[in-house]
Amino acid sequence: MGLFQKIRDFQAKRQQNAVEKNEKHVHNAKAIREDRVAAIEFFCSHKDPHIAIPALLKRFGFSLDHGIYDAREKEQAFEGIIRHGAQALPIVRNHLRATSLIAWPLKIIERLATPAEMTETLEGCLNYTDVSLDPDQTDKNYDILCHLRDYPIQQPHEKMAIFLEAHDERIRYAAVEVLIHQPYQVEVVRLIERFLLDYSAENTRLHQIVLDTYIEHKWKVLEPERLVKAGVPLGFFLSLDGVLTPRS
């Protein structure tokens, strides 16, 4: 082995040791703060996104009791990630799918992604299975749906309807919000009109938001006979063309 190869091997080994040492500090809430900050700075200046970004993402996995220090460190990690630009997107997306702590990863993606990429990311992180017994997954679905309402969804509306059956009322409500923020389509109305007819206590908020949407946008009731049977909401009457109108 030549001298230059030995030097390169020594430098690579030293760099690997530095990565491992600093990575331990980044995600250790009990580390000396100066050591953790120095570790964040180390990865912020690292040129390889496949080394720097996964390490910096770990800083979002815990919070410090001292809110100011916590915010500063997370902002520093945030800036260290977004400086890699588009190269950061697939790495952060993979992390987002695996974690239940999504606030900062979503902020990163919102900064770097186009609206279409943001929609694709959010839809790709939803869990469409029954997660009613998993509080972390339930909360994650709720948070993602709350973000998704600001974007045009790409999945078939029928797939979003899965969340209308969720046990958690927050999930049902957030799914309705996503659907009513989409451009008007009969398929959307067909999915949510059931809540216009639903006066049950567990769906009070959903009934109200759907009613407000029908009134605001003058949507036609698709099944007026069912609404009459269930009871036209107090203070409104149903016109002959199927539009709910406030009583004067």
Predicted regions located by residue number:
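Structural detector for internal amphipathic alpha-helices that build alpha-solenoid repeat scaffolds
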Residues: G2-R14, R33-D48, I68-A86, N94, ...
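Amphipathic alpha-helical scaffolding segments comprising HEAT/armadillo-like alpha-solenoid repeats
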Residues: A12-H27, K47-D65, G85-L96, P115-S132, ...
